[in-house]
Amino acid sequence: KLKEINLIQAHIEEDAGKLIHAKNNNFTYIDLNRCGSPLLEIVSEPEIKSASEAKSYLTYLRKLIKSLNIADCDMEKGQFRCDANISLRKNKNESLGTRTEIKNINSFRHVEKAINHEINRQKEILQKGDKIKQCTLQYHDKSNTINIIRSKENTEDYRYFPCPDLPPVL
């Protein structure tokens, strides 16, 4: 069964590269191979209710983008990635809880596993009576673990700045 997922926006950003946190030492490496490459970020409404829905949505979105010749979406080359935002609520009538974001998930299988992992993590925190802290997370597929890469206190911490060198796309 198809489910309609509404989009909030689509915008072009410039890839800034990535940080690689080495586990065997205290070093963080910077990979600038994709730095400066344009990327299309598509932001959807918070209407996806499960990890399997997220996987289905992304599979469809990738197929659509490829069929329209917008991008190759080669996941092995980092050309199609997902940032998953997760927030829980007790029932449909309540507003969404505090959001966490898992960055740069690079396969549909990992999207499903990472989201399920974070849902379980948040459930455990809430069942203890503690509060979810807004943060950015990284998923490690080999160990099926998540770690916090930075805390975010408010919307300003996301640091969105328009780039004067990029013209608006209408």
Task: Describe the role of every protein-language-model region.
Residues K1-L170:
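Basic, nucleic-acid-interacting segments
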